Design a protein with these regions (language model features):
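Redox cofactor-anchoring modules in respiratory/redox and cofactor-processing assemblies
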Residues: 1-188
Length: 188
């Protein structure tokens, strides 16, 4: 990598497929090989390379924010699950996470999308793989960062309001909500 940076991880196929650690980069880029590393598949093959100076908490909260923002809100497990994942990831990223939050995130992934086909679209299925793999594969790093938190910062974060997915600065727009088409007075 440029500047003598080291690879921390690679998301090989768009954010929904999950993450490979630096130690897993010798896997083949085919569907069967990446599945052995807990990934959903190859997705769009739009690779994202994360270097060693990137805080894993930032990766986690950005992924959670993306999926919470993209949820249309029609399916309960997606609307509630992505919202909860964002709240927990945001708490961790802002320096007030708990070890139990890591377990909560993994539990949420099992409750909202590990059985494909239970929602209108595939968004909850795609949301769980990156969260699950980031937490599981970088757990030691998360635990170390949580252990280094200042108790005062934890109190400050608890007092702050966590923004909803709609208030977050992604494209500066709210997600489109499904609405019933209007009908004319003539019934046409």
């Amino acid at each position: 990598m440029a500047g003598d940076r080291k690879v921390k991880g690679v998301i090989p196929g768009g954010v929904s497929v999950g993450i490979l650690t630096a130690d897993e980069l010798d896997c083949g880029l085919d569907f069967d090989d990446v599945r052995k590393y807990g990934l959903l598949g190859l997705g769009t093959a739009g690779a994202i390379v994360i270097d060693d100076r990137t805080d894993i908490r930032t990766v986690l909260v950005n992924v959670a924010r993306f999926f919470a923002h993209e949820s249309c809100g029609q399916c309960t497990q997606c609307r509630e699950g992505t919202g909860w994942m964002l709240k927990v990831a945001d708490r961790i990223a802002r320096g007030a996470g708990r070890i139990a939050d890591l377990d909560l995130l993994v539990e949420l992934t099992f409750n909202m999308g590990m059985m494909p086909g239970l929602s209108i679209c595939g968004l909850p299925d795609g949301a769980v793989y990156p969260i699950k793999t980031i937490v599981q594969k970088y757990r030691a790093e998360f635990e170390s960062l949580i252990a280094q938190q200042s108790p005062q910062r934890v109190v400050e974060v608890i007092k702050e309001k966590t923004p909803s997915a709609y208030e977050l600065p992604i494209l500066g727009q709210r997600p489109v909500q499904a609405t019933r088409p209007a009908t004319s007075a003539t019934g046409a």
